[in-house]
């Protein structure tokens, strides 16, 4: 195959248009062209008078070597798709256990199951079908189930999000992750669009299908099963204890992949007491900002924003702040909604979610400020959790209880005044909102950096500082404030042989794809350690 990049095509291009361009670039007749595979499709909207697509493709020709030899350097290059990892044959005395059914845990368990070692996947929450009912109960009635919510349950926090599949990592395993999603029902275009996403509605079916494959391959999936302790002999794993149906049970194993996510604070406390090494890490905190989606799309695409080939526009913004922390947007959800993301009673935090169609009236994004371990007020490894919790409790009180969220208009934040009434932008957060002053629940340095960032971002994206744009508090769970150090070669936790910290909760990922990649890597490490 040959790869061609930077192919500019109009918004209404057809396969015939693309083929004509390829034949011209390759200087070959139509009969040479056997197949064309899209590798990447992105929108170039830098010039609002000339919004167009930019493509990368892989082509198969009858005489590739002959065609390539007569082309100028840089027109095309040999290409092969990254191969899925080879799974070593391994033997385990007891089935390996994966703790947590988020992206890292699901992909770890699936990798182990495909290797024929019949893993046990445990999840403290419920299957995605039942979990959806718990989330609806929160949205409609303001009732929290501490074990089944936006954070806990099959699919992890990513199941109730935009289903965004972008990542800053360059791992060859990314293709494996995306292809696995497609094989389990995700749209095929995630393999090539520049900013792939699935949407919460489709992602639930994908997650359910992955679970079914794990079971079909001989693995077990146990829900409502919470890790309560490690069983060790010296510094080696011998098993775990779990709470299931109100009873404590033991599971014998010398291999545990720990993929508990960034919100299992109680589990982290248990592990710390048992001697698992942990350290503080920086993360970020802030709010969700909501604008009319039409405003964002017009700002990004100009007059052609209603073109049928263009989807709801997104954005990714970042500014340097005077204190050096930085303010940036994260997990932007076009046509989405702000959702309740609490997992503990009397604490409030928010997240963003979109369906696949991204057809909602509002756009939302996290607007975050970098926080450092010295902000935690204590050098205890879990001090970041305590600080997070205190801010979530302050937001809960400011919202008046019942998981109603405090909101503030952008104009009011910029002028240091409380919001008393809402403007043209109507909130999407359920079970409800309360106009407020976010200074009552966020530290001063975060407020000041948010103000600075909003003003600067308005210069990058016209309308970002719209007076009626809404800020919903608080976004505290963008990533984990804790890292579990692990050996770079074996990927095992320091001082605990057989324990593999994985994914976002362990501090080694930041999003669905990077967590999934890390889950695969830890599973491969365990397989190699037990290779025959």
Briefly describe each language-model feature range.
Residues 1-51, 57-532:
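Residues forming the flavin
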């Amino acid at each position: 195959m040959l790869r061609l990049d930077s192919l500019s095509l109009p918004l209404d291009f057809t396969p015939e248009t693309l083929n004509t361009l390829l034949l011209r670039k390759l200087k070959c007749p139509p009969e040479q062209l056997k197949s064309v595979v899209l590798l990447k499709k992105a929108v170039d909207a830098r010039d609002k008078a000339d919004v167009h697509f930019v493509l990368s493709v892989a082509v198969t020709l009858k005489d590739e070597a002959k065609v390539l030899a007569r082309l100028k350097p840089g027109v095309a290059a040999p290409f092969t798709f990254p191969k899925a990892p080879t799974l070593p044959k391994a033997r385990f005395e007891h089935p390996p256990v994966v703790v947590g059914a988020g992206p890292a845990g699901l992909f770890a368990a699936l990798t182990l199951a495909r290797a024929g070692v019949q893993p046990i996947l445990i999840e403290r929450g419920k299957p995605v079908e039942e979990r959806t009912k718990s989330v609806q109960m929160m949205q409609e009635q303001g009732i929290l189930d501490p074990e089944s919510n936006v954070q806990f349950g099959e699919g992890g926090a990513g199941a109730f999000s935009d289903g965004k599949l972008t990542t800053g990592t360059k791992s060859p395993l990314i293709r494996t992750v995306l292809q696995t999603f497609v094989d389990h029902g995700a749209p095929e275009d995630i393999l090539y669009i520049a900013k792939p996403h699935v949407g919460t509605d489709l992602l639930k079916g994908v997650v359910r299908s992955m679970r079914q494959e794990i079971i079909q391959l001989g693995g077990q999936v146990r829900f409502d099963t919470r890790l309560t302790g490690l069983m060790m002999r010296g510094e080696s794993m011998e098993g775990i204890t779990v709470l299931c149906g109100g009873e404590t049970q033991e599971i014998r194993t010398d291999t545990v992949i720990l993929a508990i996510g960034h919100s299992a604070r109680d589990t982290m406390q248990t592990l710390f007491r048992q001697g698992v090494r942990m350290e503080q890490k920086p993360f970020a905190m802030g709010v969700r900002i909501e604008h009319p989606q039409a405003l964002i799309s017009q700002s990004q695409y100009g007059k052609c924003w209603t073109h049928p080939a263009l989807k709801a526009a997104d954005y990714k913004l970042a500014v340097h702040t005077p204190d050096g922390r930085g303010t940036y947007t994260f997990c932007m959800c076009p046509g989405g909604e702000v959702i309740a993301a609490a997992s503990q009673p009397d604490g409030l935090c928010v997240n963003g979610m979109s369906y696949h169609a991204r057809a909602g009236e509002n756009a939302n994004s996290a607007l975050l400020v970098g926080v450092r371990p010295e902000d935690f007020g204590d050098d205890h490894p879990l001090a970041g959790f305590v600080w997070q919790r205190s801010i979530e409790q302050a937001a809960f009180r400011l919202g008046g209880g019942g998981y109603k969220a405090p909101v503030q208009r952008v104009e009011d934040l910029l002028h240091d005044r409380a919001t008393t009434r809402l403007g043209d932008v109507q909130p999407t957060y359920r079970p409800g909102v309360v106009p407020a002053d976010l200074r009552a629940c966020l530290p001063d340095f975060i407020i000041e950096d948010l103000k600075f960032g909003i003003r600067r971002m308005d210069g990058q994206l016209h309308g970002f500082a719209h007076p009626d744009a809404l800020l919903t508090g608080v976004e505290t769970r963008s990533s984990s404030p804790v890292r579990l150090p692990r050996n770079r070669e074996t990927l095992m936790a320091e001082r605990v042989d057989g324990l593999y910290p994985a994914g976002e909760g362990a501090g080694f990922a930041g999003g669905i794809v990077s967590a999934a990649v890390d889950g695969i890597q830890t599973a491969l490490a365990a397989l190699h350690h037990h290779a025959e």
